Design a protein with these regions (language model features):
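Q-loop/switch helix immediately C-terminal to the Walker
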Residues: 86, 92-108
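The feature captures the beta-strand-to-loop junction immediately N-terminal to the Walker
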Residues: 29-31
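Conserved ABC ATPase "signature" region
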Residues: 111-130
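Conserved ABC ATPase signature
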Residues: 134-142
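ABC ATPase NBD Q-loop/coupling interface
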Residues: 53-75
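Catalytic Walker B motif of ABC-type/P-loop ATPase nucleotide-binding domains
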Residues: 159-163
């Protein structure tokens, strides 16, 4: 795929080609401004491509792929989700923030599972009382944990991670990595594309390594 900026002086992504495999972690590295975040936003359907295509395999048939251009945006975003580096939470409790996606048309057919959240919080060394905390009083790490749980509960097939552990303390970073890897391993159809500058925690868990430089993607399988 290719992505041109609104001004013609620079190409943001040039001829990027790759395949994300189910059940795997793909780590994407590169210097700031190399195009990593732009690539994630294109894959998530949040930025248009100048040319090229993105296809998603239909797990009900080995020979069927869904093209992004031919798929309704709501349908695409049900299956491909982006976890941003800087979480945005609404005013209200943690519980209200977790319930918010189910008010959207794309997820009205899904059911909020509070027991799942209580179980996840237990793994994160937090009690169920955490659900009643005011979101505006959370630390940066706690906000990222809430933002992550809010996405994971929706069970996308492809999860795009834009430096999710940046600026987190060591303990919270470890908890977040463990949470994401556990979620991945719970369903063989899931895959992670993980953008990071700090590879020491995630690289040992990675199946593949992609690198981006000046908008050019290279893959090391």
């Amino acid at each position: 795929l290719d992505k041109e900026p609104s001004t013609p002086d620079r190409t943001l992504i040039s001829g990027a080609s790759g395949m994300l495999l189910s059940g795997q972690v793909t780590v994407l590295t590169g210097a700031s401004g190399s195009g990593k975040s732009v690539l994630l936003r294109v894959l998530a359907g949040l930025l248009p491509m100048s040319s090229g295509t993105v296809r998603l395999h239909d797990d009900t048939s080995s020979n069927v792929y869904h093209d992004m251009h031919e798929t309704a945006p709501i349908r695409w975003r049900q299956q491909v989700a982006l976890l941003a580096q800087h979480p945005q939470l609404l005013d209200g409790s943690v519980l209200e923030n977790l319930q918010m996606p189910y008010q959207l048309y794309a997820h009205q057919s899904q059911t909020f599972d509070i027991d799942w959240h209580v179980a996840q919080l237990e793994h994160l060394d937090r009690s169920a009382d955490f659900l009643q905390q005011d979101a505006k009083h959370l630390s940066g790490g706690e906000r990222q944990l809430v933002n992550t749980l809010r996405l994971l509960q929706l069970s996308p097939k492809v999860l795009l991670l834009d430096e999710p552990t940046a600026a987190l303390d060591i303990d919270t970073s470890t908890q977040l990595v463990n949470l994401l890897i556990s979620w991945l391993r719970a369903d063989a159809q899931r895959t992670l594309l993980w953008v990071t500058h700090d590879t020491k925690d995630i690289m040992p868990l990675a199946n593949r390594h992609w690198h981006m430089q000046a908008g050019v993607l290279t893959a090391d399988s």
